[in-house]
């Protein structure tokens, strides 16, 4: 099912953005760990999340209660693979709307991933670091602006 890292990373974006947390939890090993490095005060996450179910809950279910029309994009389709089980400094961009005030959010940062090969040959995520460098809050813009931005980029 998840035989290569590129496919797994596409599934991560789709499941996280579309609030499919039950599927998202399946791409992480049960004892997976997600850590955060956040260089902005316009968004917050816990310092770390332990366990695939907790990860899926925070990154998908809770996140999608606060934001909608979430689309995350990889800034390069060439994943900077260190070896078969590690990808480092994968640039990303997210464009979304905050439900509370309808402000548009645009953020960027880096992902680092460590994968584990399972007995069945599939890869799963064992460690994931999310660095958020910028998270702009753009209040007062029409919803059409969000659609226009998202329509110009290949997803995921």
Language-model-detected regions and their locations in the chain:
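A solvent-exposed, acidic/Ser-Thr-rich amphipathic alpha-helical stretch
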Residues: 30-91
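Short, solvent-exposed secondary-structure boundary motifs
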Residues: 63-69, 99-106
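Conserved aromatic-histidine-acidic binding/catalytic patches
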Residues: 12, 16, 43, 47, ...
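Terminal "cap-and-tail" regions of soluble proteins that handle hydrophobic small molecules
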Residues: 2-10, 98-104, 114-156
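Eukaryotic helix-grip
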Residues: 78, 84-92, 103-110, 127-135
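Hydrophobic/aromatic beta-strand elements that line small-molecule binding cavities or substrate pockets
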Residues: 73-79, 108-117
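Glycine-centered flexibility motif
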Residues: 51, 107-109, 154
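Short, low-complexity N-terminal intrinsically disordered segments enriched in polar/charged residues
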Residues: 1-14, 18, 22, 26, ...
């Amino acid at each position: 099912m998840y035989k290569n890292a590129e496919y797994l990373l596409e599934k991560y974006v789709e499941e996280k953005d579309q609030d499919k947390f039950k599927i998202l939890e399946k791409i992480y090993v049960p004892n997976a760990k997600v850590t955060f490095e956040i260089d902005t005060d316009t968004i917050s996450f816990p310092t770390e999340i332990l366990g695939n179910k907790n990860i899926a809950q925070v990154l998908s279910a809770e996140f999608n209660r606060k934001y909608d029309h979430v689309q995350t994009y990889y800034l390069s389709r060439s994943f900077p693979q260190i070896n078969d089980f590690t990808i480092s400094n994968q640039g990303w961009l997210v464009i979304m709307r905050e439900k509370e005030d309808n402000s548009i959010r645009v953020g960027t940062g880096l992902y680092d991933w460590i994968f584990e090969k399972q007995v069945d040959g599939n890869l799963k995520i064992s460690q994931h670091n999310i660095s958020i460098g910028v998270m702009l809050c753009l209040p007062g813009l029409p919803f059409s602006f969000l659609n226009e931005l998202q329509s110009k980029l290949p997803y995921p």
